[in-house]
Amino acid sequence: MSLEGIGFGYRERAPYASNPAFSRGRLVPEAESPTRTPFQRDRDRIIHSTAFRRLKHKTQVFIAHEGDHYRTRLTHTIEVAQIARALARALRLDEDLAEAVALVHDFGHTPFGHTGEDALNERMKNFGGFDHNAQSLRIVTKLEHRYADFDGLNLSWETLEGLVKHNGPLLGPYAAHPDIPVPQPILDFNARYDLELSRFASLEAQCAAIADDIAYNAHDIDDGLRAGLLTLESLDEVPLAKRLLDIVRTRYPNLDPVRTGHELVRRQITIMVEDLIEEAQRRLASARPGTMEDVHNQPRALVGFSDAMRAEEKVLKRFLFKNLYFHESVVVRRHAADRIVQDLFDACFTDPSLMPDEWRLGCEALDKAALARRVADYLAGMTDNYAVREHRRLFDRTPDLA
């Protein structure tokens, strides 16, 4: 792989990159900024939103109050954005769009991570279900109330498309998960503003999606080591990790375990990023897209790992599921978190007056499905600590997350 100029942002934009000068615009038309591109404005709106600040107090893997140094949704999001920008720069794409998609991709996550999402989806199964990606879309198109002229953030078409389809098309022959119905909130919005759900998203969105994988593959190891749920010796079971650890141990034979873990994590990020850039360049050379439209019309993603790295990543993910995500201590906390979210849903659905004024007003006029969605919107926006406090306020006994 040639590294000439790859880390610098002044190289000419690739012809297949998203170009803000040709943005498809916004649902509510706005005058253009004289100082910022549409994608830069999207990024800035995302950063200044309430939903972005709430990520600080939402769980990644470990419950937020377990320690000050474990990753939250916010720190994870910042790490994803950094990797996404690096990938976009290397491939001569629009860094601002890649960053915007990365920054917004986790907006819809509930308190307590995927446990909270599963709990809400269970309670919402008769009312259209709950999906964090669809919830992210609801937040940026409806639930944020910052602007006088519109609800949401009125993001550009390209950022919305990247948010909804960063993991692949949702419909058609190339759908990433054809057996899973498209969440109703996405279908409802798509009827108003066509995001072309059967086509691949931009390369910038693809960079954001794979940056998410790179970030959590590495940083969950870091947090797992810090928590004592993983050990450097156990990571020798993972071929990729062992190969990198052998390099570290050979070069630094007397290095302490903490720094050894950090050296592993940073090397893993580097090797995955370099593999992805090289593989993306190979796919681009083969597909030879000449425009953004050519990217959308491809039969596969053009940004992805090589077959060899993908195989190694699958082994790593299996290891993390077995030894970290389903570790006994994590599972116990997940059961407690599940109880908290389901209890809160049941209470607020039965008696909407338990919710704050801005959420309960008008509930008496809603049918059951609309009321359930209102309650889900309220609960999904909670931070971990707020959910615990509300449960303690409403119930005599709250499950212990400590």
Swiss-Prot record:
PANTHER family: DEOXYGUANOSINETRIPHOSPHATE TRIPHOSPHOHYDROLASE-LIKE PROTEIN, DEOXYNUCLEOSIDE TRIPHOSPHATE TRIPHOSPHOHYDROLASE. Residues 73-217 form the HD domain. SUPFAM superfamilies: HD-domain/PDEase-like. The keyword Hydrolase applies. HAMAP family: dGTPase_type2 (MF_01212). Keywords: Hydrolase. GO terms for molecular function: dGTPase activity. Pfam families: HD, HD_assoc. Disulfide bonds: none annotated. This is Deoxyguanosinetriphosphate triphosphohydrolase-like protein. Coiled coil: none annotated. GO terms for biological process: dGTP catabolic process. Belongs to the dGTPase family. Type 2 subfamily.
